[in-house]
Amino acid sequence: MSAEPSGITLVCFALRREAAPFAKSAAARPRLRTLVTGIGWDNAAREVRAALAAERPRLVLSCGFAGGLNPDLPAGAVLFAADAETGLGPALLAAGARPARFHCARQAACTAASKRAAWAATGADAVEMESQVIHTLCHQQKVPCATVRVILDAASEDLPLDFNLLMTPDQRLDPLKLALTLVKSPAKVRALLRLGSQSRRAAGQLAGVLARALGLEHQGQ
């Protein structure tokens, strides 16, 4: 790993659909790199460790969806927790993001009941599955880091499926398990399509906040 930061800002997402709107707006910015890590601690650790070893960035962002835990926060709210060294706090506030506490879980919180339990246990505003390990790796290398996440599902919402039951051991969605589940419960198809639409809106909202906070809109984006 190089001793000095490269000037690159590394923006990490678990899933391509989370990353797509931001990646499009950042495509012409050579100092902005988008990294899709895969879901969960292990995938994030592997991909971010490799990225840090290849080229030390000046800044790392952990971005994507989160589940709401604080019942006062609606779906679509963009939240952040940033190291002071990032210097991003004022820009994120001005872009419409709210400061928050995140709980980094090993499994998805798919029901309102599980989110209530997580809120009671942690006091966090939102739950996701990658940021803690990303922050830890960055702090080990003295690279400033921030988490910027959009609430996909509010605290009171159940997801249409228990996605934990549909994952492979390496935290990928198993298409066969998904297909079998939908065959058994065809009524879930409509709810899953609604979630897809909701996720596209959320990804766009997150991309807008990131673009404003990182100055892309002032650079012709």
What feature does the model see in each segment?
Residues T9-R17:
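Gly/serine-rich nucleotide phosphate-binding loop at the start of the catalytic core
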Residues G7, A20-Q221:
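Glycine-rich phosphate- or other oxyanion-binding loops that anchor nucleotides, phosphorylated ligands
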Residues M1-E4:
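Short boundary motifs at domain starts and secondary-structure transition points
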